[in-house]
Amino acid sequence: MPPVMSLRALICVVLIAAAPAAAAPFVPESDSQVLERLPFSSGDPGLRRLRGLNDQLTRTPNDLPLAILVAQGYAELGRTTGDPRYAGYAQAALAPWWGLDRAPQEVLVLRAALRQRMHQFDLALTDLATVLNTNPRNVQARLMRATVQQVQGAYDEAKQECRALQDLTQELVWTACLANVNGVTGELRQSYEQLLSVFARYPVAEPKLRSWVLTSLAEMATRAGMMTAAEAHFRAALALDAADFYLLGAYADYLLDDGRPPEVLALLRDKVAADPLLLRYALALQAAQHSQELPARVEQLRDRFAASRLRGDRVHLREEARFTLHLLNAPQEALKLAQENWQVQKEPADIRILLEAALAANDATAVGIATDWLRNCRLEDMQLSRLMPAAKHQG
C-alpha cells in the first residue's frame, strides 16, 4: 500500500482527470491576469493559501514542486466547481514545462489529467505512455490510462491496466478500476457486489477515495435498476464531497430518471454556473412544467453552447446533444451532435443520447450502430433497456 500522501496525490490526479471540463480552459497571458480574474473568496482559508502559493510561484516560476502544488490546487478547484478557467490557471502554473515532450514525470501526469479534462484523449495517452515507458510502476499514470481507455471504449486495454495495478496499490483502488470496466462489459451485478464487498473493508479510507468509489457504486446500481441502493450511495458520496459538480450531475440524472424533478431544482438552484448542471436544471424545469423560468434557461444554454462553438470547444457535445433533443426538440441536429460526440467518447451516457437521438430522428442506420455497440460490449443499463423495443422496431 502506498503511503498516505502518495495515495492522496493519486486520488487528486485521477479525480481531476475524470471530471468533465465545463468549457475550453482559459489560459492567462500573465500571472497578474490569473490573480486578476480568479473569483477568490476572502473567507476561504484554502483559497487564500492557494493565492499565496501562486504569489510565490510568480516570483519563482521554475520551482517545480511549488508549480505542481499550485497546478493541482487549481485543477482541484476546476473539478469541484466546474469553472473552466481553473484548468487554464493550472496550465499556466506549469508553463515552463508545458510544451516539453520530455517534461518531468509529475508534469506529464498532471498534463495528461488536464488534457483528459479537455477531451484531448490521444495527447493524454501520449503523455501517459512516456511516463510508463520510463516508470512502469507509476500508479497515477496506470489508473489514468485505464480511465481514458474505458472512455474510448478500449475495454480490454483498460482491464489490462487495472490488473497491472494489483501489485502497485491498495485493493480498493484496483478493484474500483476493474469494477468500473467490467461493469460496462457484461458483468454489472458481479462488479457491483465485488466492489461493495471490498469497500466495506475500508471504512476509514481517504474521503476522496471513498467518494469516488461511492459514486461508481451509485452509477452501477442505477444502471442495474437498484434505485434504493443507488440513492444511498449517492447520498453517502455527497456527504463526503457535496461540492463535486460531476457527482451533482450524476445524482441529478438519477433523480430525473426517477421522476423527481423538484429535487433536482432544489439540488442545483444555486449551482448553474457549470453548463452541465444548468442543463440538468433546465431539464428539471421542463419535467416539472415550470413554464415561467424555463424559456430564460433555454436561451442561457443556447448562448453558452453557441459561445463554445465559436471558441472551437467541443468538450460538451453530449450535453449539447441532450439540450438539442430534449429542450429544442430538434432530433436531426441532436443526432449530428451525438454522432460527433460518439467519435470521441463511448460512456453509457454517450450511447444513450446517441440511441435516443437516432430513434427520435427515425434514423435506422444510426439506431443500428448503437444497438450493435450495445450487443458487442454487453452494456447493461435499465434506461437503455427501455429503449430497446423501439430500437428493434426501427432497426
What residues fall within each predicted segment?
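Single-residue signature of alpha-solenoid repeat helices
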Residues: 49, 90, 124, 158, ...
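N-terminal leader/linker segments that initiate helical-solenoid repeat arrays
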Residues: 22-106, 126, 393
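Structural motif corresponding to the intra-repeat A-B loop/turn of tetratricopeptide repeats
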Residues: 77, 81-84, 118, 152, ...
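Short coil turns that delineate tetratricopeptide repeat
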Residues: 61, 102, 136, 169-170, ...
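Residue-level recognition of tetratricopeptide repeat
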Residues: 72, 76-79, 113, 147, ...
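Canonical tetratricopeptide repeat
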Residues: 69, 110, 144, 177-178, ...
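Canonical positions in the second alpha-helix
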Residues: 56, 96-97, 130-131, 164-165, ...
